UniProtKB/Swiss-Prot annotation:
It is an enzyme of class 3 (hydrolase). It is found in: Secreted. The active site is at 166 (proton donor). It comes from Rhizopus oligosporus (Rhizopus microsporus var. oligosporus). Residues 447-542 form a propeptide. This is Chitinase 2. Belongs to the glycosyl hydrolase 18 family. Chitinase class III subfamily. GO terms for cellular component: extracellular region. Residues 323-354 have a biased composition (Low complexity). PROSITE patterns: GH18_1, GH18_2. SUPFAM superfamilies: (Trans)glycosidases. The keyword Glycoprotein applies.
């Protein structure tokens, strides 16, 4: 593992040889990184803020996070090991002078430094517009041009605010944004980080009513990830041009920095090299790429240097990183691991634009695909055999683009063809419309089930649950739902799973004492037929 000092030296050497100089452009494209949480988890996997800004591979950094606000007293920040243990007297607000010094270094190099509010962990939100307006004054005093005895970054002044509001309610955020606009200069950046299902469960109405400079749409941990047939950048582009108060708002393609950075939705560089130029050429609202997070990307075999070259070269394929810029890839042990199996996966049809037709020839035994009328078809001894999904469900491709399942959906049309990851991207960028997975609703919770992969005997999926009130999830969360009779849930990465009949209970151990969202990986078996998603009703989170 590279030390922070050596990492910085390696980056500097690489930049000296290439002449790359990062700087924010109001017209884009830009590369943005979330920094502060060290989600890679190693003692040396997160370098200092200044190191990333000096790399020449970052146009903006999002300080992550100001995670507690408007719950009484002054707010709190959490930057993992980058700032720990030194609090202002009689508060839980950290004093981070080293980060303040690095903010100035970044700004001297043209890199924007944006404070991200919210995140998965923490407690936050407003109950009125007046609270939102008052909090704008707090941000001005603590991080802007105002005065306070408790300024975490000293006299450094941030360049913007990012609303990464994962849970709670929409109340007060429009008033907050409008008040920020009145206090800060016209070049102060205000962004948001909605999840890709449209409209966002929390920020949907806020995005329609307040003026944002960019939105970091999270294309991961959901059905609308970039490698699935429901990739919906076109939906967000349409919102930018028709609904957003700021018709020049930029849509950032936000992705995980490595396979361990998210529950699902990681896009390898080989696929990004197809997606990014397609987005850049097709959508005028495209603003570049945002990444969760710096610690993951910089420990992913040159991902960071290749991405920056890709985005700023107009999408042409960058050369492989030189040895001086390469960083050692680290691995992270997770609660669940992928088993190696000899089972033939129900791979999707390989002919772009074609749909299987019952009794017509096919070439790959046990190949699965969606038909034009919402059924699913299996290649059986050289012919397609079509079957109907259970009542009220339709055939939907999995998020990895390699298989299918039957699920509850909204919208109409066809999900056919289900094709490979690169072919899916081409189809999706063509503004393909069709049914998408229906949200799961429970008391005080909005959730999505993203089915990441299936084969003949097993499945993997991600439950993405978000609080819709100001009350967070606690350390222990019980998740209950009903599953079809042919499906057995057996594992989760957050705690034990028990299934009696078709009743499933997951005893999830939250990574945080309090959080506004839960992302739970689950696995299980398929006794017969194909994977059928659980009913969207009768879900409980307690």
């Amino acid at each position: 593992m590279l030390t922070r000092t050596f990492l910085g030296m390696a980056i500097s050497a690489f930049l000296a040889s290439t002449g790359v100089q990062a700087a924010w452009s109001s017209h884009g494209p830009n590369v943005m990184y979330y920094w502060g949480q060290n989600s890679a988890g190693g003692s040396n996997t997160q370098a200092s803020l200044g190191t990333y800004c000096e790399s020449g591979q970052v146009d903006a950094v999002l300080l992550s996070f100001l995670h507690v606000f408007n719950v009484g007293g002054i707010p709190e920040i959490n930057l993992s090991s980058a700032c720990a243990g030194t609090y202002f007297p009689n508060t839980q607000l950290l004093s981070c002078p080293a980060v303040g010094a690095d903010i100035k270094k970044c700004q001297d190099k043209g890199v924007k430094v944006i404070l991200s509010l919210g995140g998965a962990a923490g407690v936050y939100g407003f109950t009125s517009d007046a609270q939102g307006q008052q909090f704008a004054q707090t941000i001005w005093n603590l991080f802007g041009g105002g005065n306070s005895d408790t300024r975490p970054f000293g006299d450094a002044v941030i360049d913007g605010v990012d609303l990464d509001i994962e849970g709670g309610s929409s109340t007060g955020y429009v008033a907050f944004v409008n008040a920020l606009r009145q206090k800060f200069s016209s070049n102060f950046l205000i962004g948001a980080a909605p999840q890709c299902p449209f409209p966002d469960a929390i920020l949907g109405s806020v995005l329609n009513s307040a003026s944002f400079d960019y939105v970091n749409v999270q294309f991961y941990n959901n059905y609308c990830s970039a490698t699935g047939s429901s990739f919906n950048f076109d939906t967000w582009d349409n919102w930018a041009k028709t609904t957003s108060p700021n018709k020049n708002v930029k849509i950032m393609f936000t992705v995980p920095g490595s396979s361990t950075a998210a529950g699902s939705g990681y896009v390898p560089m080989s696929t990004l090299q197809t997606i990014v130029p397609s987005l850049a050429s097709k959508y005028s609202s495209y603003g570049g790429v945002s990444v969760w997070d710096a610690s993951q990307a910089w420990n992913n075999g040159g991902f960071n240097s290749q991405l920056y070259s890709l985005v700023h070269s107009g999408g042409s394929t960058p050369p492989p990183p030189s040895s001086s810029s390469a960083t050692k890839t680290t691995t992270k042990t997770t609660a669940t691991s992928t088993k190696t199996t000899t089972t033939t996966a129900p791979t999707a049809t390989s002919t772009p634009g074609s749909c299987p037709v019952a009794n017509q020839p096919c070439s790959t035994q046990n190949q699965y695909a969606c038909t034009a009328d919402g059924k699913y078809a299996v290649c059986d001894h050289g012919k397609w055999v079509a079957s109907s999904c259970p009542s009220n469900t339709v055939c939907i491709p999995t998020t990895d683009g390699a298989s299918i399942y039957c699920g509850y959906a909204t919208g109409s049309g066809s999900t056919c063809p289900s094709v490979s990851a690169l072919e899916i991207t081409a189809a999706s960028l063509g503004s393909k419309n069709g049914p998408v997975p229906r949200p799961y609703k429970a008391s005080k919770v909005a959730a999505q089930l993203a089915v990441t992969s299936t084969d003949k005997n097993s499945f993997e999926a991600v439950i993405n649950a978000r609080r819709t009130t100001l009350t967070p999830f606690e350390k222990s969360v019980t998740i209950e739902f009903t599953t079809p009779s042919n499906i057995k849930f057996t594992e989760s990465d957050m705690g034990p799973v028990r299934q009696v009949g078709n009743k499933v209970r997951i005893q999830a151990k939250n990574d945080y004492n309090e959080s506004m969202t839960l992302v739970v990986k689950v696995k299980g078996s398929i006794n017969s037929g194909v994977f059928v998603a659980p009913s969207t009703s009768a879900w409980n989170f307690k």
